[in-house]
């Protein structure tokens, strides 16, 4: 099978395109497919905070596959064994949470590449990613088409940002606003002026280093700020939050209810 692996999301980052995404936390392939028909450039399937199993991730990749939206998987952690499974089910773009040091970044790079570039385990004959052994020269193509994003979301990571940006094999750095603001002493307050200043500075440093800069902003005004600061892959909502907002707003049309605010500004 002479198929060529391509990764439109990675190609867009290389060109500097602005790509707008949506966070998927509902854990269902049905909701993933609905989102894929909306036209977002990328869809983040969350395995860190949403209760997704590897098989759940697999089914959502299948649901998104017929559409133009590009899937990004965030596993619960950056362990070598888990990364191997997630890549084998067909993920081409990974977002690895809680990367605090350059050494962690190097370990993740190694886990995502086949030898001699890394230590990814070989099992193409049983992998959806290789069409069960039918893609010629799969290992080399996989190394080339893989897109690796890491999350910087702590004070320690901020201190090590420049070193992380120097790690070869990292395509982009994503600022995790919720954990970052908590680490800086402003829990649930990513809109604090000091946090905003740091986010803007980080985006500038990431782009200056030749990497893509990413962000999740559930507040449209914050999303626009990040785009203006230079972030080029930005998620502008979370499916479960949009669903609860819609439910609450519709109920409020007919009943006087007390519910959570529909204008939550942080993840």
From Swiss-Prot:
UniProt-annotated site: Increases basicity of active site His, residues: 88
Function: Catalyzes the reversible retro-aldol cleavage of 2-keto-3-deoxy-L-rhamnonate (KDR) to pyruvate and lactaldehyde.
Organism per entry: Salmonella paratyphi B (strain ATCC BAA-1250 / SPB7)
Known partners and oligomeric status: Homohexamer.
The EC number(s) this enzyme carries: 4.1.2.53
Annotated site (Transition state stabilizer): 74
Keywords for this protein: Lyase, Magnesium, Metal-binding
Residues reported to bind substrate: 151, 178-179
PANTHER family in the record: 2-KETO-3-DEOXY-L-RHAMNONATE ALDOLASE (PTHR30502:SF5)
Binding annotation for Mg(2+): 153, 179
Similarity comment text for this entry: Belongs to the HpcH/HpaI aldolase family. KDR aldolase subfamily.
Ranges in coiled-coil conformation: none
Database matches in Pfam families: HpcH_HpaI
The protein, known as: 2-keto-3-deoxy-L-rhamnonate aldolase
Active site residues according to the UniProt entry: 49
InterPro entries in the cross-refs: Aldolase/citrate-lyase_domain, HpcH-HpaI_aldolase, KDR_aldolase, Pyrv/PenolPyrv_kinase-like_dom, Pyrv_kinase-like_dom_sf
Cofactor: Mg(2+)
Cofactor binding summary note: Binds 1 Mg(2+) ion per subunit.
Reaction catalysis annotation: 2-dehydro-3-deoxy-L-rhamnonate = (S)-lactaldehyde + pyruvate
One Gene Ontology term, aspect cellular component: cytoplasm
GO MF: 2-keto-3-deoxy-L-rhamnonate aldolase activity; magnesium ion binding
Claim: Magnesium is one of the keywords in the record: yes
Domain of life: Bacteria
């Amino acid at each position: 099978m002479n198929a060529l692996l391509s990764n439109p999301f990675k190609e867009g980052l290389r060109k500097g395109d602005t790509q707008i995404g949506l966070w998927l936390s509902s854990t269902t392939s049905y909701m993933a497919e609905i989102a894929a028909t909306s036209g977002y450039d990328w869809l983040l399937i969350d395995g860190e905070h949403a209760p997704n199993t590897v098989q759940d991730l697999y089914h959502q990749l299948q649901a998104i596959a017929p559409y133009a939206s590009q899937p990004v998987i965030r596993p619960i952690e950056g362990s070598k064994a888990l990364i191997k499974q997630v890549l084998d089910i067909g993920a081409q773009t990974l977002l690895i949470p809680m990367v605090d040091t350059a050494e962690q970044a190097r370990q993740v790079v190694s886990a995502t590449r086949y030898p001699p570039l890394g230590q990814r385990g070989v099992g193409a004959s049983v992998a959806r990613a290789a069409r069960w052994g039918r893609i010629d020269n799969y290992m080399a193509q996989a190394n080339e088409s893989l897109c690796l994003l890491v999350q910087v979301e702590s004070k320690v990571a901020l201190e090590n940002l420049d070193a992380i940006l120097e790690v070869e094999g990292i395509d982009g750095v994503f600022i995790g606003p919720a954990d970052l603001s908590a680490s800086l002493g402003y829990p649930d307050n990513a809109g604090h002026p000091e946090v905003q200043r740091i986010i803007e500075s980080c985006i500038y440093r990431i782009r200056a280093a030749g990497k893509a800069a990413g962000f999740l902003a559930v507040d449209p005004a914050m999303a626009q700020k990040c785009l203006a600061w230079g972030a080029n892959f930005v998620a502008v909502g979370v499916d479960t939050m949009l669903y609860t907002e819609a439910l609450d707003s519709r109920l409020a049309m007919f009943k006087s209810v007390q519910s959570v605010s529909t204008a939550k500004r942080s993840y």
